[in-house]
């Protein structure tokens, strides 16, 4: 008769223990405890974010989700969704869920990392040449995982610096210029030329459009097709000083053009972070590149105003776009996280103030809390190297020679103790490789 009460007591004890473990797990991840202050920081970010989207989104509304991280950006119900999924034939939806914790943690890491592929990065990776290097070479699968390292190095050598040519905060004000046909509605040319750095995309021309897109061009992000036409791309900038950043792989035809024409512009391969199902295309990679080296980033020529009907380019015929409503919502999220400032025909005032934009303190507190919730490496720890998944020492004599003179960049290098942080592109769990100087 006493067996049942004992069994019941054991079950109750087990259940209570499970509940306590569960509740404990809600506030502690990998030793990094999520405090009440952390939750308050996320709540403040979410609340301010919703107000920012409502105030600046030209009809978009932000609806808080089921927790402090999630938010839904909603289009007006009368929005005419023109784009259809080529696989299903279904029109694009009018609401999109975003995870603010993921976005804050990922983008703030981008701001403190390099986005240029280097030789020291490949050398430092475990089996970097056998497992990674060949993937950055067109048809690299035929290179037998770079067992002949000399051959692989020969194919990469023209685009592979030893150490990063750019560092975080190296530049002040940067403009990323997209290719949208909306650029022809507003004469942004002089305004764009006033930036310290201008980043353009693919084969977008400058001549004949200068009053709309400006004349300055510091960098150009290239997709696969544009990279294979490198000889034509270099003609777009009369100064021939534009640095060309290829986001895919190096081709033999590219190497041939660099050597034989010759092309004297700097050419590099991009090393980037994965943002999952976020806005796609060269535009997002251009923003990522800009955020990795600029204090502030402004964007022009992205289709971000209401009334989208088709993907247009300012220099050619209309083309089929890709998830335009999702893209507009994602870029609005970026603006309301303080990452970029949007310029468009309906937002043409250069002095426009982004209402309810978060402060640096708000973002920093939310980043710390987000990293704890997401179990990011080093979450809750202090110090510049706490987020590093791997730390490797540079060989003697290979410390990067810095010509950086901006105070903000020098302060960043001082904070990082001279270390360089790289995103681990092919690491399923994300993470960062940090290269430190030999002391």
Curated annotation (Swiss-Prot):
GO terms for biological process: protein glycosylation. The chain crosses the membrane at residues 3-23. Its EC number is 2.4.-.-. Residues 1-2 are cytoplasmic. It is found in: Golgi apparatus membrane. Keywords: Glycoprotein, Glycosyltransferase, Golgi apparatus, Membrane, Signal-anchor, Transferase, Transmembrane, Transmembrane helix. Pfam families: Glyco_transf_29 (PF00777). Residues 24-439 are lumenal. It is a single-pass type II membrane protein. Glycans are attached at residues 112, 148, 208. It comes from the Eukaryota. GO terms for cellular component: Golgi membrane. It is an enzyme of class 2 (transferase). Gene3D superfamilies: Glycosyl transferase family 29. GO terms for molecular function: sialyltransferase activity. May possess sialyltransferase-like activity in vitro. Belongs to the glycosyltransferase 29 family. This is Sialyltransferase-like protein 4. It comes from Oryza sativa subsp. japonica (Rice).
């Amino acid at each position: 008769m006493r067996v049942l009460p004992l069994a019941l007591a054991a079950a109750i004890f087990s259940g209570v223990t499970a509940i306590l473990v569960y509740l404990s797990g809600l506030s502690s991840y990998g030793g990094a405890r999520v405090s009440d202050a952390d939750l308050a920081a996320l709540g403040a970010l979410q609340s301010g974010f919703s107000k920012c989207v409502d105030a600046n989104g030209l009809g978009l509304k932000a609806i808080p989700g089921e927790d402090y991280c999630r938010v839904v950006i909603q289009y007006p119900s009368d929005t005419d969704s023109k784009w259809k999924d080529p696989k299903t034939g279904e029109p694009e939806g009018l609401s999109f869920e975003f995870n603010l914790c993921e976005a804050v943690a990922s983008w703030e890491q981008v701001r403190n990392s390099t986005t240029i592929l280097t030789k020291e990065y490949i050398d430092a990776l475990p089996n970097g040449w056998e497992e990674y290097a060949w993937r950055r070479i067109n048809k690299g699968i035929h290179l037998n995982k770079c067992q002949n390292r000399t051959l692989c190095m020969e194919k990469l050598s023209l685009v592979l610096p030893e150490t990063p040519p750019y560092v975080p905060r190296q530049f002040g004000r940067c403009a990323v210029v997209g290719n949208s046909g909306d650029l022809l509605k507003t004469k942004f040319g002089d305004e764009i030329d006033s930036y310290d750095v201008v980043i353009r995309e693919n084969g977008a021309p400058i001549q004949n459009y200068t009053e709309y897109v400006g004349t300055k061009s510091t960098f150009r992000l290239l997709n696969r097709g544009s990279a294979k036409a490198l000889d034509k791309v270099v003609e777009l900038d009369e100064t021939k000083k534009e640095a060309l950043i290829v986001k895919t792989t190096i081709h033999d035809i590219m190497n041939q053009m660099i050597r034989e024409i010759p092309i004297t512009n700097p050419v590099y391969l991009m090393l980037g972070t994965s943002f999952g199902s976020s806005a796609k295309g060269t535009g997002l990679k251009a923003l990522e590149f800009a955020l990795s080296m600029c204090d502030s980033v402004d964007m022009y020529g992205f289709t971000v105003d209401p009334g989208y009907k088709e993907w247009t380019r300012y220099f050619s015929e209309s083309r089929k776009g890709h998830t335009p409503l999702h893209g507009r919502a994602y870029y609005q999220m970026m603006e309301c996280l303080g990452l970029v400032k949007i310029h468009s025909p309906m937002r043409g005032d250069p002095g426009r103030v982004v209402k309810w934009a978060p402060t640096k303190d708000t973002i920093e507190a939310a980043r710390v809390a987000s990293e704890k919730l997401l179990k990011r490496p080093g979450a809750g720890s202090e110090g510049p190297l706490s987020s590093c998944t791997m730390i490797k020492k540079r060989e003697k004599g290979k410390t990067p020679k810095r010509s950086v003179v901006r105070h903000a960049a020098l302060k960043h290098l001082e904070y990082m103790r001279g270390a360089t942080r790289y995103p681990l592109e092919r690491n399923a769990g994300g993470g960062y490789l940090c290269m430190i100087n030999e002391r």
